Amino acid sequence: MADTKPHLNLAFIGHVDHGKSTLVGRMMYEMGAIDEHIIEQYRKEAAAKGKATFEFAWVMDSLKEERERGVTIDIAHQRFDTDKYYFTVVDCPGHRDFVKNMITGASQADAAVLVVAAPDGVMAQTKEHVFLARTLGVNQLIVAINKMDATEPPYDEKRYNEVKEEVGKLLRMVGYKIDEVPFIPVSAYNGDNVVKHSDRTKWYTGPTVLDALNALKEPQKPVNLPLRIPVQDVYSISGVGTVPVGRVETGVLKKGDKVIFEPAHVSGEVKSIEIHHQEIPEAYPGDNIGWNVRGIGKNDIRRGDVCGHVDNPPTVAKEFTAQIVVLQHPSAISAGYTPVFHCHTAQVACTITEIKAKLDPRTGSVKEQNPAFIKTGDAAIISVRPTKPMVIEKVKEIPQLGRFAIRDMGMTIAAGMCQNVTPR
């Protein structure tokens, strides 16, 4: 069975309309993950709406509303197999207001494909997504320079090199090692260099997207870290009881384990664990599971709670120290500012009580102690007090629960990681 292959979560990131969904659709289509008759149906539907070129992207779109608008909304979990891995696609939509989806999506990703349209080059969201991917700990990256069929002239090597240079500069700035990142000229729509090398880019001798995916390193599963499962949803299933759903970030969950949910502070015994509607005896990092806990009611826990073992419970912060980088803010950030922190599945308003130091974003060394304010482009060490209880861990101890994004005014203001926690 395919599941004996190692599993990777793959995010597709990049600016809106640069072709992320089309590339995913093309990939799934080429890898035989979609039936021919479904593609045919999509082709007809798209043509009827006057969106003939949307056929592959439609594979990713499951919501009626999205189709009418012609954009991808929710994070779609799709899967396809290569000869080496099986991938779950965490499709990260590109529209501005969907960045917070990306925050929850990208933090689940082992690797990302950055899609940049050759005619446009680097755009605002290209920068934002690269930045977030880096901050959220996505260390493996593949760059697909897409829409090569739309350059002047088509499949122009010069334009490819210009965009490659521009993207390379951006990646270096946030700390990716450029020599480890493959850059691939593609046309997702026509299939050039996605699975097979294209005759239209004879000047390119590097890997296809498929080659690059197979060359990714298998992530080490953090099984030895304490158990942490952020709750995404809670269901009440008749005959079973309360079933929280979430992704195991660290540790191992076994049937019969005594677990506690924080900050709800309720505990119970694990009766059963399910993955894709199949019961399993234990769950490992990366598994998206539903688990039933004896003695816990549907209203006892909610999204944003974190499940851990009773003898090593998740840390509830009274306050914490963090390192952040300000992505964008219309004015300046000073002590007393209370935006919303998105950490794992929790969204909690937190007050920045003190700006301890301003850092050089490239090196991390201190530029200024106790600055009065910080603004776009600055990196800083801050003290934070959540307005209500929330779980956050030191990034050095449990990185998966130590990273966060800060949002306000419908945009991502900053991204950061927790360095120290004062437990409640």
From Swiss-Prot:
Belongs to the TRAFAC class translation factor GTPase superfamily. Classic translation factor GTPase family. EF-Tu/EF-1A subfamily. It is found in: Cytoplasm. GO terms for molecular function: GTP binding; GTPase activity; translation elongation factor activity. Keywords: Cytoplasm, Elongation factor, GTP-binding, Hydrolase, Magnesium, Metal-binding, Nucleotide-binding, Protein biosynthesis. This is Elongation factor 1-alpha. It comes from Methanothrix thermoacetophila (strain DSM 6194 / JCM 14653 / NBRC 101360 / PT) (Methanosaeta thermophila). Residues 187-189 are annotated as: G5. Residues 91-94 are annotated as: G3. GTP binds at residues 14-21, 91-95, 146-149. It catalyses: GTP + H2O = GDP + phosphate + H(+). Its main location: cytoplasm. GTP hydrolase that promotes the GTP-dependent binding of aminoacyl-tRNA to the A-site of ribosomes during protein biosynthesis.
